[in-house]
């Protein structure tokens, strides 16, 4: 009964990990809002068009939810983009875009939702990190920088708002079979000429468990961090990567 009628907000829940988490929480009984620029293929009364880099759109979306539900219990700041490029290959426009979406958009969302949870004296937040919170990867300096920032944002925010019974954790997936991964592979193939099947085989091969992860596996961990089952867990960088960063 823990999930029954809990109000959850997920950014970027039209596809990938966000969608898997949305479906899991709804199956558990939660009311889940999807804030995303990409419209779902199937009509969803809980879908709100939202560009996370625009503060006014975030504020309007959250206000709309509050007008109807009067509270927000759970937040998963999932929306983000990837960039496969060295520092020299990264344009200023690309830098501004990825920082705006991966970092500033998360800050804007927290800035709006945390006061709501503070007034409620309870809330659970999960931020989307990456295995690159822990390690560096080639051609990933700017993307890794944004995810490192999210890890620190989670830890400091957890400390600041623990007295208000608000928990903040950072989920840190490894390589997961999502549209984001497929776009990254497509870009790598176009850049290097490596056949796509070789790239996917290599991605499986470097994982201790011999395969990449599935969105549903990350969703299950996000649900755990959002739930009361993790009531003494806050400020954690929660790796779900098949053991990749242990190597």
Task: Put a short name on every predicted segment.
Residues 14-15:
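Conserved glycine-rich cofactor-binding loop
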Residues 86-87, 94-99, 203:
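Substrate-binding pocket helix/loop in short-chain dehydrogenase/reductase
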Residues 88, 135-141, 163-164, 210, ...:
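Active-site loop immediately N-terminal to the catalytic Tyr-X3-Lys motif
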Residues 110, 146, 154:
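Active-site helix of classical SDR
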Residues 130:
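Residue(s) in the substrate-gating loop at a strand-loop-helix junction
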Residues 135, 223, 234-247:
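Short C-terminal tail/terminal secondary-structure segment
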Residues 162, 167, 233-235:
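Short, small/polar-rich loop/turn modules that mediate ligand/substrate recognition or access, typified
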